[in-house]
Amino acid sequence: MTTLGTPLSHHATKVMLLGSGELGKEVIIALQRLGVETIAVDRYNHAPGQQVAHHTRTITMSDPALLKALIQAEKPDLVVPEIEAIATPMLEVLEATGVVRVIPTARAARLTMDREGIRRLAAETLGLPTSPYQFCDSFEELQAAIEGGIGYPCIVKPVMSSSGKGQSKISGPADVQKAWDYAMAGGRVSHGRVIVEGFIDFDYEITLLTVRAKGADGQIETHFCEPVGHLQVNGDYVESWQPHPMHPAALERARHIAKTVTDDLGIAVDGQASGLGIFGVELFVKGEQVWFSEVSPRPHDTGLVTLTTQWQSEFELHARAILGLPVNTALRNPGASAVIYGGVDAKGIVFDGVDEALRVPGTDLRLFGKPESFVKRRMGVALAAHADVEQARVNAKLAASKVKPRAA
């Protein structure tokens, strides 16, 4: 039996989110609906999740001393990482010494904080199919890797980055220097390390939202949402839709890959397979073939579409799973999402055209409330529900196009 407390009381169930962007904001809302006291942590003030949480804290989460002091002071029941740039070795120490439980596990947070940890786990430890790859610490190593077997075309990404930052496609020798320089500018750390991947000629890519949750007998079960199709431009999601049709054999392989990697990431530092929550498993598909790409041990940006498609969104699934509650991954109706970009570099943004956007049939909006806009910063998302998923895509993109952010 799961017992939950009352917020702002001595018996509250307290959850701390490390990273409070648009995904964290929705997780916080889902937790609050279940009576959980929430603490939103981010590197800057007034982050989206901080706008709705019971408590807010602003620190450099990659600083182990600051992170340890904050967790010891707040004493949350659960710590939920929402981003990669966190002092994950400290989380492992705190989890191992019983100070706090990390979702899904501190080990998963460490392994997925950069592309190297998770790629080596998937390909070298678990033997999952991936694109050919090599890690490089210099421009010369990158050149040698490409010429020595990776070949053209190929994809270069910083080992630590997100939302496509620093990622580019290399079509020939003339592109290598530009790609290296772009990767160095887009990575999260100052030292230069990249992954170069051989290009897979895939038909489409999906996110398979995979949930580890407790069943009625207390044992951990794996649940799958319907496949989420998505379109990425330079590694950054611009639209997603659900369900994406798949050949039954490809879907079976996708689920096998997703379960294999999430089972492993569910193993805590003590060796127990205790990790709970949702994972966004990204996969390439060609016919009946499936390749592992990446995994996030948390809600996924492409999964924003589930706000309009599922009985329980990915955020509600995450909240329920980590609290030990039952989950329902069933589809309610087909739908789609389309990103609303900032379009301008400015602090203090207003949005024109919201009324026009919501006149598109079956649509809804989420405006994230980010205090500063950049031209390519994700400031909101349009959602559309329709019995025909292709029409939902049209409607979502139309609604998104009506919203015009501008400086106040």
Swiss-Prot record:
<dbReference type="GO" id="GO:0005524">
    <property type="term" value="F:ATP binding"/>
</dbReference>
<dbReference type="Pfam" id="PF22660">
    <property type="entry name" value="RS_preATP-grasp-like"/>
</dbReference>
<feature type="binding site">
    <location>
        <position position="82"/>
    </location>
    <ligand>
        <name>N(1)-(5-phospho-beta-D-ribosyl)glycinamide</name>
    </ligand>
</feature>
<comment type="subunit">
    <text>Homodimer.</text>
</comment>
<dbReference type="InterPro" id="IPR003135">
    <property type="entry name" value="ATP-grasp_carboxylate-amine"/>
</dbReference>
<comment type="function">
    <text>Involved in the de novo purine biosynthesis. Catalyzes the transfer of formate to 5-phospho-ribosyl-glycinamide (GAR), producing 5-phospho-ribosyl-N-formylglycinamide (FGAR). Formate is provided by PurU via hydrolysis of 10-formyl-tetrahydrofolate.</text>
</comment>
<dbReference type="InterPro" id="IPR016185">
    <property type="entry name" value="PreATP-grasp_dom_sf"/>
</dbReference>
<keyword id="KW-0547">Nucleotide-binding</keyword>
<feature type="binding site">
    <location>
        <position position="205"/>
    </location>
    <ligand>
        <name>ATP</name>
    </ligand>
</feature>
<keyword id="KW-0460">Magnesium</keyword>
<dbReference type="InterPro" id="IPR013815">
    <property type="entry name" value="ATP_grasp_subdomain_1"/>
</dbReference>
<dbReference type="Pfam" id="PF21244">
    <property type="entry name" value="PurT_C"/>
</dbReference>
<dbReference type="GO" id="GO:0043815">
    <property type="term" value="F:phosphoribosylglycinamide formyltransferase 2 activity"/>
</dbReference>
<keyword id="KW-0658">Purine biosynthesis</keyword>
<feature type="binding site">
    <location>
        <position position="294"/>
    </location>
    <ligand>
        <name>Mg(2+)</name>
    </ligand>
</feature>
<feature type="binding site">
    <location>
        <position position="157"/>
    </location>
    <ligand>
        <name>ATP</name>
    </ligand>
</feature>
<feature type="binding site">
    <location>
        <position position="115"/>
    </location>
    <ligand>
        <name>ATP</name>
    </ligand>
</feature>
<feature type="binding site">
    <location>
        <begin position="162"/>
        <end position="167"/>
    </location>
    <ligand>
        <name>ATP</name>
    </ligand>
</feature>
<keyword id="KW-0436">Ligase</keyword>
<feature type="domain" description="ATP-grasp">
    <location>
        <begin position="120"/>
        <end position="323"/>
    </location>
</feature>
<dbReference type="InterPro" id="IPR011054">
    <property type="entry name" value="Rudment_hybrid_motif"/>
</dbReference>
<dbReference type="GO" id="GO:0005829">
    <property type="term" value="C:cytosol"/>
</dbReference>
<feature type="binding site">
    <location>
        <position position="282"/>
    </location>
    <ligand>
        <name>Mg(2+)</name>
    </ligand>
</feature>
<dbReference type="InterPro" id="IPR054350">
    <property type="entry name" value="PurT/PurK_preATP-grasp"/>
</dbReference>
<dbReference type="GO" id="GO:0004644">
    <property type="term" value="F:phosphoribosylglycinamide formyltransferase activity"/>
</dbReference>
<dbReference type="GO" id="GO:0000287">
    <property type="term" value="F:magnesium ion binding"/>
</dbReference>
<keyword id="KW-0479">Metal-binding</keyword>
<dbReference type="Pfam" id="PF02222">
    <property type="entry name" value="ATP-grasp"/>
</dbReference>
<feature type="binding site">
    <location>
        <position position="301"/>
    </location>
    <ligand>
        <name>N(1)-(5-phospho-beta-D-ribosyl)glycinamide</name>
    </ligand>
</feature>
<dbReference type="InterPro" id="IPR048740">
    <property type="entry name" value="PurT_C"/>
</dbReference>
<feature type="binding site">
    <location>
        <begin position="22"/>
        <end position="23"/>
    </location>
    <ligand>
        <name>N(1)-(5-phospho-beta-D-ribosyl)glycinamide</name>
    </ligand>
</feature>
<dbReference type="InterPro" id="IPR011761">
    <property type="entry name" value="ATP-grasp"/>
</dbReference>
<feature type="binding site">
    <location>
        <begin position="377"/>
        <end position="378"/>
    </location>
    <ligand>
        <name>N(1)-(5-phospho-beta-D-ribosyl)glycinamide</name>
    </ligand>
</feature>
<comment type="pathway">
    <text>Purine metabolism; IMP biosynthesis via de novo pathway; N(2)-formyl-N(1)-(5-phospho-D-ribosyl)glycinamide from N(1)-(5-phospho-D-ribosyl)glycinamide (formate route): step 1/1.</text>
</comment>
<comment type="similarity">
    <text>Belongs to the PurK/PurT family.</text>
</comment>
<feature type="binding site">
    <location>
        <begin position="197"/>
        <end position="200"/>
    </location>
    <ligand>
        <name>ATP</name>
    </ligand>
</feature>
<keyword id="KW-0067">ATP-binding</keyword>
<dbReference type="InterPro" id="IPR005862">
    <property type="entry name" value="PurT"/>
</dbReference>
<dbReference type="GO" id="GO:0006189">
    <property type="term" value="P:'de novo' IMP biosynthetic process"/>
</dbReference>
<feature type="binding site">
    <location>
        <position position="370"/>
    </location>
    <ligand>
        <name>N(1)-(5-phospho-beta-D-ribosyl)glycinamide</name>
    </ligand>
</feature>
<protein>
    <recommendedName>
        <fullName>Formate-dependent phosphoribosylglycinamide formyltransferase</fullName>
        <ecNumber>6.3.1.21</ecNumber>
    </recommendedName>
</protein>
